[in-house]
Amino acid sequence: MRVTGKGSGRVSIAGLVCLKPGQRPRLIYRTRVFRGRKHEPKGFAEPDYIALLDRAHQRLGGNLVLVWDRLNTHLSAPMRRRIAARSWLTVFLLPTYAPDLNPVEGVWSVLKRSLADLAKRTIDQLAAIIKSRLDRMQYRPELITSLVAKTGLDLRPP
């Protein structure tokens, strides 16, 4: 999400839609604000994604099966090494450019629609609103379930 005008910047978001049999679906996310400062990271790198996965593992417990898009950071050699070091993590990749199969893309779509009519704000105000909207989504399991259902993927355990 970008903000234009004085004090512009960007809010980057990385998220996971998590399903565990017998539990409500979960949305786990991280945000990063970029204010345009020199040497400030503009987005997420491998360590950030791994920290998100580690957090999901800690919150959910047990092994994780990750169905991931083909973002270049997700496919990099450093990321593959980090994933290989986690015996509890199995990764399956979605086909190239398949946002319709990724429930997280549905989360971003719902979020963006909810932000469409906002007046211009500062980047910090925008970041706070984004976190608030994502926090609300975390407590709407029916929404997360519907976003998974829209993908058409059968994610039930065998």
What annotation goes with each model-predicted range?
Residues 1-158:
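Short functional hotspots at interaction and active-site rims
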